[in-house]
Amino acid sequence: MLSGLALQDNGIPIYVQLREQIAAAVGRGVLAPGARLPTMREVAVALSIDLNTVQRAYAELERDGILTMVRGRGSFVAETPPQRPRRADTREFAARIAAQAQAAGIALDELAEALKKLAGRT
């Protein structure tokens, strides 16, 4: 699982990148329901990041119903992943896209216009 993680210095917090990459791996079926994830310490050491960063990513994944953490046993992909994104997830996703756009030098009004065109509303 660790070999597929690629963290970048792109203005997006590391815990967000880690959380999103794990969630995407679950969504694509790379991490199957019930699969055990590496320990937080293993992830922190392998990626040369702070343990608190990994803890925050795992905690948010658990909050979102993607992971289940069992004290003394480890972290596992939830047997029944969440079905629909919540409104808070949509806002968070939009905030991440906005941060990426700004880091790339794209004005937010340009981004909004491009999204409207993609949605078929000009």
Feature names for model-found ranges:
Residues L61, R84, L118:
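The DNA-recognition helices of helix-turn-helix-type DNA-binding domains
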